[in-house]
């Protein structure tokens, strides 16, 4: 059928991918489409494996178009020094912050990353900023990012500078992390109910949460051989 690509035919696939690159270049540079520039950067990264060109397009799309997804991707490049960029956590933090605040497909991931970098302290002269970390973990947790919910539970479980210990909030965020599939969220909530640690003791809930943690752990082990580490 006309228009369909035979993906078993190497020449057809090559022509298709070349045309795709041309189309995305036109969208980006001629039509000035921010989404087109983001697609072009992804094309260079995923198809051509040309990370330097991808980084260049991402910078253009951030500087000229303030594209949320490109800010997220550029931030990830700065974290690892990808595409010939220097490892620069402050630049990464700035990119993630802009992506988080602008909204978009990767904004929740970006909010979580802002929390991680603020918590780490290396973007603030080696001084951890627990309050900023909490605020951005909250944004990500509100968007159902399980790891941020768990990090909030750990923060309230232990307390931090500017954040008093709060066992009720620790339990709330542990249970939310658990509901989103975070094994340790389930395990921590189970332990709190089992020991009556700052909350009313409840053996039934403790057992239920422990079983969910076990089930999630088993599911993760079954999936692990098929998962490769991404960015």
Swiss-Prot record:
SMART domains: SEL1
Keyword Repeat in record: yes
UniProt entry keywords in alphabetical sequence: Mitochondrion, Repeat
InterPro entries per record: HcpB-like, Sel1-like, TPR-like_helical_dom_sf
Record flagged with keyword Mitochondrion: yes
Main location: mitochondrion
One Pfam family named in its UniProt record: Sel1
Stretches forming Sel1-like repeats: 34-66, 68-104, 108-145, 146-182, 183-218
GO cellular component assignments: mitochondrial intermembrane space
Residues annotated as signal peptide: none
Domain of life: Eukaryota
Cellular location(s): Mitochondrion intermembrane space
Entry similarity comment: Belongs to the hcp beta-lactamase family.
Function statement: May be required for assembly of mitochondrial respiratory chain complexes.
Name of this chain's protein: Cytochrome c oxidase assembly factor 7A
Source organism of the structure: Xenopus laevis
């Amino acid at each position: 059928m006309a228009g369909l690509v035979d993906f078993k035919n190497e020449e057809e696939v090559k022509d298709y991918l070349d045309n795709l690159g041309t189309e995305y270049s036109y969208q980006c540079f001629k039509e000035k489409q921010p989404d087109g520039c983001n697609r072009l950067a992804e094309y260079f990264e995923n198809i051509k494996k040309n990370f330097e060109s991808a980084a260049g397009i991402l910078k253009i799309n951030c500087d000229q178009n303030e594209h949320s997804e490109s800010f997220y991707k550029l931030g990830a490049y700065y974290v690892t020094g990808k595409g010939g960029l220097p490892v620069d956590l402050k630049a990464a933090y700035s990119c993630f912050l802009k992506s988080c605040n602008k909204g978009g497909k990767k904004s929740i991931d970006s909010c979580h990353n802002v929390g991680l970098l603020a918590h780490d302290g290396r973007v603030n002269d080696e001084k951890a900023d627990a309050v900023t970390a909490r605020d951005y973990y909250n944004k990500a947790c509100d968007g159902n990012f399980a790891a941020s919910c768990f990090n909030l539970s750990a923060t309230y479980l232990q307390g931090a500078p500017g954040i008093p210990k709060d066992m009720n909030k620790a339990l709330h965020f542990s249970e939310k992390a658990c509901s989103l599939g975070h094994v340790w969220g389930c395990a921590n909530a189970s332990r709190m109910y089992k020991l009556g640690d700052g909350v009313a003791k409840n053996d039934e809930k403790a057992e239920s949460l422990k079983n969910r943690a076990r089930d999630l752990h088993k599911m993760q082990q079954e999936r692990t051989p098929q998962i490769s580490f991404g960015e």
